[in-house]
From Swiss-Prot:
HAMAP family per UniProt: Transaldolase_1
Protein name per its UniProtKB record: Transaldolase
Record-annotated active site: 128
CDD domains, sorted: Transaldolase_TalAB
Keyword Glycosyltransferase: no
Enzyme category, top tier: transferase
UniProt organism field: Opitutus terrae (strain DSM 11246 / JCM 15787 / PB90-1)
Length: 315
């Protein structure tokens, strides 16, 4: 019988580590792991992972661009993570390609080729792409090539609908960043059940199950343990080590909140978006527009910092 909340949660939700810290993964035994440029940058600056930076620089060769070294570094981190977790790792495409469909596809193929060179099959990789119109179109084509994608920076229902229609493998609707925006915008605090980020994932999960979409829903970006518990039953939840620790430290009961059978009976209408209506709906959602652009800028800035780190290490 599971004792702590983490073990209880694992009974009906796949737990994923939102981290590049190998030690925390060994402690909490998630099935999958997610990385992003910010997490890789943080890890790359730590002594424990310096050898991976050195290996990426050496193996890429003196003539390689900083971008090529970073590609290899992401893959080396991912390959190490896959020695710990039994499932999949998510590796992110350079955020500066968020509005470049062709460039995103080329980068994804490069990352997959590098993984396969490390002996990692593509079935264990999810390529993360920003949930822009261009990112979703890139993912649609990549899925047809057998490259599984994880749509990140997803803050709105239209983004989720477009991703499902494109038959992407998985989406990562953000929870905490939505809460951040609403708290700042309204000055209010929200009870866990009324958390706007939680409500967003609940709506998406219900829609997907109601209409039989196979795209997996992985709630992401949590600010507190209560947000996680309100989404117990979601397909997957990617959780930072601090919150994994809080769940593991509590023995309070965990109640399943999201049920596929209940969702299939929900009275919701099927909707569809072409490019024009997608862009308009996203633009009409101030929160989603601001958080998407903020997220892209932030990840792009961390990629640039990684490039600077590579240049410094090269001397």
């Amino acid at each position: 019988m599971p004792t702590n909340q983490l073990e209880q949660l694992k009974q009906f939700t796949t737990v994923v580590a939102d981290s590049s810290d190998f030690d925390s993964m060994k402690s909490y035994q998630p099935r999958d792991a997610t990385t992003n440029p910010s997490l890789i940058l943080k890890a790359a600056g730590m002594p424990d992972y310096g050898h991976l930076v050195e290996k990426a620089i050496t193996d890429a060769g003196s003539g390689a661009s900083p971008a090529a070294v970073i590609d290899l570094l992401l893959v080396l981190f991912g390959a190490e993570i896959l020695k710990i977790v039994p499932g999949r790792v998510s590796t992110e495409v350079d955020a500066r390609l968020s509005f470049d469909r062709v460039g995103s596809m080329e980068k994804a193929r490069t990352l997959i080729a590098l993984y396969e060179k490390q002996g990692v099959p593509r079935e264990r990789i999810l390529i993360k792409l920003a949930s822009t119109w261009e990112g979703i179109r890139a993912a649609e084509k990549l899925q047809q090539e057998g490259i599984n994608c994880n749509m990140t920076l997803l803050f709105s229902f239209p983004q989720a609908v477009a991703a499902a229609k494109a038959k992407v493998k998985l989406i990562s609707p953000f929870v905490g960043r939505i809460l951040d925006w609403y708290k700042k915008s309204t000055g209010q605090d929200y009870a866990p059940a009324d958390d706007p980020g939680v409500n967003s994932v609940r709506e998406i999960y219900t829609y997907y199950k109601r209409f039989g979409y196979e795209t997996e829903v992985m709630g992401a970006s949590f600010r507190n343990k209560d947000e996680i518990l309100e989404l117990a039953g979601c397909d997957l939840l990617t959780i930072a080590p601090k919150l994994l620790g809080e769940l593991a430290a509590s023995t309070d009961p965990v109640e399943r909140k999201l049920e596929p059978e209940a969702a299939r009976k929900a009275k919701v209408k099927r909707v569809s978006f072409d490019e024009k209506s997608f862009r308009w709906a996203l633009n009409e959602d101030q929160m989603a527009t601001e958080k998407l652009s903020d997220g892209i800028r932030s990840f792009a800035a961390d990629v640039r910092k990684l490039e600077q780190l590579i240049q410094q290490q090269r001397g």
